Amino acid sequence: MERIVLFLAIVSLVKSDQICIGYHANNSTEQVDTIMEKNVTVTHAQDILEKTHNGKLCSLNGVKPLILRDCSVAGWLLGNPMCDEFLNVPEWSYIVEKDNPINSLCYPGDFNDYEELKHLLSSTNHFEKIQIIPRSSWSNHDASSGVSSACPYNGRSSFFRNVVWLIEKNNAYPTIKRSYNNTNQEDLLILWGIHHPNDAAEQTKLYQNPTTYVSVGTSTLNQRSIPEIATRPKVNGQSGRVEFFWTILKPNDAINFESNGNFIAPEYAYKIVKKGDSAIMKSDLEYGNCNAKCQTPVGAINSSMPFHNIHPLTIGECPKYVKSDRLVLATGLRNVPQRETRRQKRGLFGAIAGFIEGGWQGMVDGWYGYHHSNEQGSGYAADKESTQKAIDGITNKVNSIIDKMNTQFETVGKEFNNLERRIENLNKKMEDGFLDVWTYNAELLVLMENERTLDFHDSNVKNLYDKVRLQLKDNAKELGNGCFEFYHKCDNECMESVRNGTYDYPQYSEEARLNREEISGVKLELMGVYQILSIYSTVASSLALAIMIAGLSFWMCSNGSLQCRICI
């Protein structure tokens, strides 16, 4: 009995000095997905998917957009009378055009290679309008009567501001031969047109000559157009049509015009004074007096995140568009407060801290650390070195992911004419395919990195555990839950030496050996006592059973229930 009491006293004494290795926990409810699991609660996480915008059109890097309101690009460049506010425009960061602007080609017709012209604008930030052929220089032709009720201004007939519709003068239309030399250092955008009358009577009334042409030539262009006279349905009250053309005139090049009728001559041209990243965006939004780095048709984005799911079309320094609803990177640990007392699952990359059944909410100044208890008390202490290394590693990884993904990335709608619908459909399918690939890559990246991060934390906890185990050796007992029981007294100074890696094993080894042997001896003696008691119990119970059987047999024989015969 004295041995048992001594054993219990020793066990009680040793249990009072313990050190445990554990990790931080908090009240976070943030969840992430990994390759192996979904909705894993973690202590810290970082969202890398931007989902919000401001619903406005903003300046990009301080430069306002050119918002054409009810005008189209064609209406702006040709000078539709209803677009006079855009006759001279400052530098723009991008151009905004509505889906179906009402002020486009007021006189019905067509704009040749219109989609290519819009593509040109995607690399232009500023035009300077200059006069190349003054209206007053057409002394042999009528340069003021070429107007139409289809292009009204202040209740009167008018025409496009930047071109001149030349008609006969004094019943004559002399052949035009006019040249312009580009002496500027910049490229010039030049526009002109040809008129297609409704019938022969209109042809001779306007131009006198029944058979006419318009010829244009530069060092790279050789074009000859002939009017097509035909009866057509009226559009905007007009049966005639106009067809507009454009070209880029390089510095030191010349453009030559020759025509004997139906010529719509250029008065102004556009000097391309600044090239850069621009685009034409389809949107009905108004300017919001704001500044941003990234613009979408539904609003501006101000974000450093690498991905967004707001709109596939963007302009500026934008995150990459993905179709995902959620992309969250784990930056902290699995959040398993100790009260839950459930074992952690092991991950794909070898999560190895599953022997610890919960985190500590009491440890707030680090991710990994210690809890000790001895005669002087108990407390938590973070291992700041391993915590800082982990923070630096994860921060660098997150920043690396963001830097690699968050490059200047923009995608704008491409323009196709009616003859290119199959190309447009193919282009849309290809873009959808690219978006699917981007989305898959982004989601897989997040799942893989989250798995690695959580396993990285588990590995750090295990490394801390091994650091303590290798120091203590047989001076302490592993309890299997991340804790060690000392076989010797370990005061606060001793605990600190374990934590900082300076534990003096020889100093405590003799005390630990004696306590360990004492506990082992008590265990052996108790085991011998238990064996004697078990033998005695077996013999006694067998003897009692034999006596009971003999008594029962005697009783049954005496009352005749059992016949007993003894044969010799």
Swiss-Prot record:
Annotated membrane topology: Single-pass type I membrane protein
Positions in the Cytoplasmic compartment: 553-568
Positions where lipid (S-palmitoyl cysteine) attaches: 557, 564, 567
SUPFAM superfamilies recorded: Influenza hemagglutinin (stalk) (SSF58064), Viral protein domain (SSF49818)
Domain of life the protein comes from: Viruses
GO MF annotation: an example: host cell surface receptor binding
Glycosylation sites: 26-27, 39, 181, 302, 500
Subcellular compartments: Virion membrane; Host apical cell membrane
Main subcellular location: virion
Site (Cleavage): 346-347
UniProt keywords, alphabetically: Clathrin- and caveolin-independent endocytosis of virus by host, Clathrin-mediated endocytosis of virus by host, Disulfide bond, Fusion of virus membrane with host endosomal membrane, Fusion of virus membrane with host membrane, Glycoprotein, Hemagglutinin, Host cell membrane, Host membrane, Host-virus interaction, Lipoprotein, Membrane, Palmitate, Signal, Transmembrane, Transmembrane helix, Viral attachment to host cell, Viral envelope protein, Viral penetration into host cytoplasm, Virion, Virus endocytosis by host, Virus entry into host cell
Matching InterPro entries: Capsid_hemagglutn (IPR008980), Hemagglutn_HA1_a/b_dom_sf (IPR013828), Hemagglutn_influenz_A (IPR000149), Hemagglutn_influenz_A/B (IPR001364)
Matching Pfam families: Hemagglutinin
Disulfide bonds: 20-483, 58-290, 71-83, 106-151, 294-318, 490-494
Membrane topology, Extracellular segments: 17-531
Signal peptide positions (record): 1-16
Any one annotated GO CC term: viral envelope
A GO biological process held by the record: viral budding from plasma membrane
Function: Binds to sialic acid-containing receptors on the cell surface, bringing about the attachment of the virus particle to the cell. This attachment induces virion internalization either through clathrin-dependent endocytosis or through clathrin- and caveolin-independent pathway. Plays a major role in the determination of host range restriction and virulence. Class I viral fusion protein. Responsible for penetration of the virus into the cell cytoplasm by mediating the fusion of the membrane of the endocytosed virus particle with the endosomal membrane.
Subunit structure: Homotrimer of disulfide-linked HA1-HA2.
Family the entry assigns: Belongs to the influenza viruses hemagglutinin family.
Additional information: Major glycoprotein, comprises over 80% of the envelope proteins present in virus particle. The extent of infection into host organism is determined by HA. Influenza viruses bud from the apical surface of polarized epithelial cells (e.g. bronchial epithelial cells) into lumen of lungs and are therefore usually pneumotropic. The reason is that HA is cleaved by tryptase clara which is restricted to lungs. However, HAs of H5 and H7 pantropic avian viruses subtypes can be cleaved by furin and subtilisin-type enzymes, allowing the virus to grow in other organs than lungs.
Protein name in UniProt: Hemagglutinin
Biological source species: Influenza A virus (strain A/Tern/South Africa/1961 H5N3)
